[in-house]
């Protein structure tokens, strides 16, 4: 059995002000995304934005992630609770963010920013997709430090006892998601972007691979108590929300490969 490290969720306290690791992980993900996107804007001739526009894009995306992630969590996962405790909606430092809500927020941010600068929405998504897994991985580390979103009870050597998860060891599902949705997904997408490839291949890969990774990792994660298993006595809310991403990613990839066969696909 692995030992849970018991990290204090508060990274720094200045008088009454508490700075939580959870928030710092989001800031780290946003900063890393800004840095790599700016780098790509300098070296990629097909980049839909200029390096000096990356800061504004990052601001739009950060708002989309925070607002969309929080609103998505409230709507998808715990609406009755927040309906009766509306003030809790603003306690972001206690956790409670939805990737799928954040993804919708980012799509809205992309649409608004693309319209502002006159860029193509899908080109913008293709350009930014390789750096998104960094933020996903950072968020999962924040979940792990918070001791939340732990996995199912297990007798596996990978199990650990979480402070709020009862006396039995559980899968550290946050670390599984950090590895597959963060490390593996980033590595695959970044390697694909090194050489020329068909347009929108990376966008399709991101949506398809993330959806698959999340769907699989959900089998190790404890279902949300307010929902449990929703369909077939094994499907969770996270899996249901991942299916549209898998399907849309598959559609994009199929369209790309059809264009390749017809020699109508533009490489970038």
From Swiss-Prot:
Query: A single GO CC term, please?
Result: plasma membrane
| UniProt binding sites for a 1,2-diacyl-sn-glycero-3-phospho-(1'-sn-glycerol) | 140
UniProt keyword terms in alphabetical order? Cell inner membrane, Cell membrane, Membrane, Transferase, Transmembrane, Transmembrane helix
- Predominant location of this chain? membrane
What membrane topology term does the record carry?
Answer: Multi-pass membrane protein
Q: So which domain of life are we looking at?
A: Bacteria
Which GO biological-process labels does this protein carry? Answer: lipoprotein biosynthetic process
**Where is this gene product found?**
Cell inner membrane
Q: Mind listing the GO molecular function terms for this protein?
A: phosphatidylglycerol-prolipoprotein diacylglyceryl transferase activity
- According to its UniProt record, this protein's enzyme class is transferase
- Mind telling me which residue stretches traverse the membrane in this protein? 14-34, 57-77, 90-110, 117-137, 174-194, 200-220, 240-260
Pathway named in the protein's UniProt entry: Protein modification; lipoprotein biosynthesis (diacylglyceryl transfer)
EC annotation?
Answer: 2.5.1.145
Q: Does the keyword Nuclease apply?
A: no
**Which portions of this protein are annotated as coiled-coil regions?**
none
The family annotation for this protein states: Belongs to the Lgt family.
Q: What does this protein do?
A: Catalyzes the transfer of the diacylglyceryl group from phosphatidylglycerol to the sulfhydryl group of the N-terminal cysteine of a prolipoprotein, the first step in the formation of mature lipoproteins.
Protein name, UniProt field: Phosphatidylglycerol--prolipoprotein diacylglyceryl transferase
* Species in which this protein is naturally found: Francisella tularensis subsp. tularensis (strain SCHU S4 / Schu 4)
């Amino acid at each position: 059995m692995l030992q849970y490290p018991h990290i204090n969720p508060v990274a720094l306290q200045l008088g009454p002000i508490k700075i939580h690791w959870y928030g710092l992980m989001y800031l780290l993900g946003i900063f890393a995304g800004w840095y790599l996107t700016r780098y790509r804007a300098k070296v990629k001739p097909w980049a839909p934005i200029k390096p000096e526009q990356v800061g504004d894009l990052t601001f739009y995306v950060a708002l989309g992630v925070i607002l969309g992630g929080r609103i998505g969590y409230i709507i998808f996962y715990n609406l009755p609770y927040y309906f009766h405790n509306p003030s809790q909606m603003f306690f972001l430092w206690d956790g409670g963010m939805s990737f799928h809500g954040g993804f919708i927020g980012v799509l809205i941010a992309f649409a608004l920013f693309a319209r502002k600068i006159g860029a193509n929405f899908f080109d913008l998504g293709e350009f930014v997709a390789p750096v998104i897994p960094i933020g996903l991985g950072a968020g999962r580390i924040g979940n792990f430090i918070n001791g939340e979103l732990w996995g199912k009870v297990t007798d596996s050597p990978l199990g650990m006892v979480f402070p709020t998860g009862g006396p039995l060891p559980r899968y550290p599902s946050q670390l599984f998601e950090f590895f597959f949705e963060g490390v593996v997904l980033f590595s695959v997408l970044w390697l694909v972007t090194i050489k020329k490839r068909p347009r929108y291949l990376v966008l399709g890969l991101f949506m398809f691979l993330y959806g698959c990774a999340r769907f699989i990792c959900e089998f190790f994660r404890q279902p949300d108590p307010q929902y449990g298993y929703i369909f077939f006595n094994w499907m969770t809310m996270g899996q249901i929300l991942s299916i549209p991403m898998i399907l849309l990613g598959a559609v994009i990839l199929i369209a790309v490969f059809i264009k390749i066969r017809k020699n109508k696909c533009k490489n970038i």
